[in-house]
């Protein structure tokens, strides 16, 4: 069966949560523009069930992820904390939970290269599947910049239903 046939058999909607990882955002010192953009765009495809801004702290990121999952999210998108500074801990927090890692990061970096050139080596955007006993959740981790989020959303919106179909098999 080809990609188009798989997409026809894919779910038609999903529930999603958004987590913004930002020290300044969590303190109210910086407006979160990326989280609301994700909510706006994914609301065209699914139901928004969770949103939270957390500091760059592993425990806070994990608590928010588990809250999003408990809220019924089939898909969780994080934004922020994917760079290479000491405070960028989103990937280290979430990636160990993945049962399967997707090639999202490679595609994201290829698309980003078209926009920012070699600076794309600074991103560690990733995605993966977390399998529970009764539920499966797809997690995408995007950089915090609005332009990077737009790039990530282009990929997510194109493949999220296809990913959900296969993840649930």
Curated annotation (Swiss-Prot):
Any one of the GO BP annotations: Mo-molybdopterin cofactor biosynthetic process
UniProt record similarity statement: Belongs to the MoaB/Mog family.
SMART domains, per database record: MoCF_biosynth
Entry's EC annotation: 2.7.7.75
Gene3D superfamilies reported for this sequence: MoaB/Mog-like domain (3.40.980.10)
Protein name: Molybdopterin adenylyltransferase
Entry-linked InterPro entries: MoaB, MoaB/Mog-like_dom_sf, MoaB/Mog_dom, MoCF_biosynth_CS
Temperature dependence: Optimum temperature is >80 degrees Celsius.
Alphabetized GO MF terms: ATP binding; molybdopterin adenylyltransferase activity
Catalysis: reaction(s): molybdopterin + ATP + H(+) = adenylyl-molybdopterin + diphosphate
EC category name: transferase
Keyword Nucleotide-binding carried by entry: yes
Gene Ontology CC terms, in alphabetical order: cytosol
Function: Catalyzes the adenylation of molybdopterin as part of the biosynthesis of the molybdenum-cofactor.
CDD domains in the cross-refs: MogA_MoaB
SUPFAM superfamilies: Molybdenum cofactor biosynthesis proteins (SSF53218)
Pfam families from the UniProt entry: MoCF_biosynth
Subunit structure: Homohexamer.
Keywords: ATP-binding, Molybdenum cofactor biosynthesis, Nucleotide-binding, Transferase
């Amino acid at each position: 069966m080809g990609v188009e046939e798989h997409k026809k058999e894919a779910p038609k909607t999903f529930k999603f949560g958004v987590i913004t990882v930002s020290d300044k955002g969590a303190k109210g010192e910086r407006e979160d523009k990326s989280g609301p953009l994700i909510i706006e765009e994914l609301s065209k495809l699914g139901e928004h069930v969770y949103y939270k801004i957390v500091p760059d702290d592993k425990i806070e990121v994990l608590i928010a992820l588990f809250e999003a999952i408990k809220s019924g999210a089939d898909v969780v998108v994080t934004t922020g904390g994917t760079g290479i500074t000491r405070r960028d801990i989103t990937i280290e927090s979430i990636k160990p939970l993945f049962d399967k890692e997707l090639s999202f990061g490679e595609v994201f970096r290829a698309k980003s290269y078209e926009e920012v050139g070699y600076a794309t080596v600074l991103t560690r955007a990733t995605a993966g599947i977390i399998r529970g006993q009764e539920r499966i959740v797809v997690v995408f981790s995007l950089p915090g910049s609005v332009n990077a989020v737009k790039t990530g959303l282009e990929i997510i919106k194109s493949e999220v239903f296809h990913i959900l179909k296969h993840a649930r098999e």
